[in-house]
Regions:
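Repetitive helical segments and hydrophobic/amphipathic motifs
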Residues: 11-12
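Short loop segments at secondary-structure junctions
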Residues: 163-167, 273, 291-294
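Acidic/His- and Gly-rich active-site-bordering loop/insert found
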Residues: 42-43, 47, 55-58, 62-206, ...
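C-terminal motif of bacterial Sec signal peptides marking the signal peptidase cleavage site
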Residues: 15-16
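Short, low-complexity, disordered segments immediately C-terminal to signal peptides
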Residues: 21-34
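A short glycine/serine-rich beta->alpha loop
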Residues: 203-212, 275
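Acidic/histidine-rich catalytic neighborhood of metal-dependent amide-processing enzymes
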Residues: 214-290
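Positively charged n-region of N-terminal signal peptides that target proteins for export
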Residues: 1-4
Length: 294
């Protein structure tokens, strides 16, 4: 499930909300992917990102392998205000650290989410559905474990926040509901039948209803927020994760939510895989008729 690799990019994006008054030393330039790949492949990186490893240990290793990172790492360790390339590099290293340390945990969390069949029922409205309620309870447990703020908006939207120092918020929109399952579509080329609600690894892919759309995103964001919080990087804006429960069936839950609260001024949508999403403001249908000639 390639979306799990978004954790590095996402954490960097969240960290970029860090306040940036006048500041510390500047590095020689932003660290690039080849350098990050070299750090990730180092045997010592495994120890630095093990259960007992810390972000500071990982930064020390990174500065040892890439000496030009040393000023940014030193500024971070003395809690100086970061800006420019220093901020970019610490953010990117935090993303890499999060991916190496938490990837297995993200997959495990995604598996737990996939196991909850949050398909819309014809018998009860979504906000009364036991599976939607169970999903909210799972998110609440993770949020509390990670030291994040949680709010359940009447089982319509589950909200998780990482507070920043300023009044502004940055929103991340996701959804927990999934489309119905067609059993014939869950068969591999060799005839193996898959359980849609059991996350299954086949080669380098993970199969499960909602693994991409959109439960893998939710698990990834939660661990990204956890990593940012534990890093101690100061946020200028509050990060607000919003988990809608009716996205696949009209979005009534988001309408309810908007009547109850104010959306952040800036939001990103993590929904399946798109090259770019500027905004999703609604949907429509075009009907046309054409004369036919025999």
């Amino acid at each position: 499930m390639k979306k799990l690799w978004l954790s590095a990019t996402l954490v960097a994006a969240l960290s970029a909300c860090t306040s940036m008054p006048p500041a510390a030393s500047q590095a020689g330039g932003p660290i690039k992917k080849p350098e990050m790949d070299r750090i990730a492949a180092a045997p010592a990186a495994m120890a630095a990102t093990a259960a007992s490893g810390s972000f500071s240990q990982f930064l020390a290793l990174s500065a040892q392998m890439q000496p030009e990172l040393a000023p940014a790492v030193a500024a971070y360790e003395r809690k100086a205000t970061l800006q420019g390339d220093d901020l970019v590099n610490i953010s990117r290293l935090l993303g890499l650290y999060n991916r190496l340390k938490n990837q297995a945990a993200v997959i495990d969390a995604t598996a737990r989410m996939v196991s909850i069949p949050t398909v819309r029922s014809d018998k009860v409205p979504p906000h009364e559905d036991k599976h939607i309620i169970a999903f909210g309870a799972l998110v609440e447990g993770m949020a509390k474990e990670f030291g994040l703020q949680y709010r359940n908006v009447d089982n319509r939207v589950f909200e998780v926040k990482l507070p920043g120092s300023g009044p502004d918020e940055f929103g991340i929109l996701t959804h927990s509901d999934v489309v119905p399952v067609v059993a014939d579509e869950w068969v591999l080329d060799d005839g193996t039948k898959l359980d849609p609600f059991k996350l299954t690894r086949v080669g380098g892919n993970l199969y499960g209803r909602g693994s991409i759309d959109d439960k893998g995103s939710i698990a990834t964001v939660l661990y990204a927020m956890k990593a940012v919080k534990e890093s101690g990087l100061p946020l200028a804006r509050t990060i607000r994760l919003m988990i809608e429960t009716t996205e696949e069936t009209g979005g009534d839950a988001m309408k309810y939510y908007r009547a109850k609260t104010t959306l952040p001024e800036y939001n990103i949508v993590l929904d399946s895989k798109y090259p770019a999403v500027v905004a999703e403001k609604g949907s429509g249908a075009l009907r046309a008729s054409f004369p036919l000639q025999a």
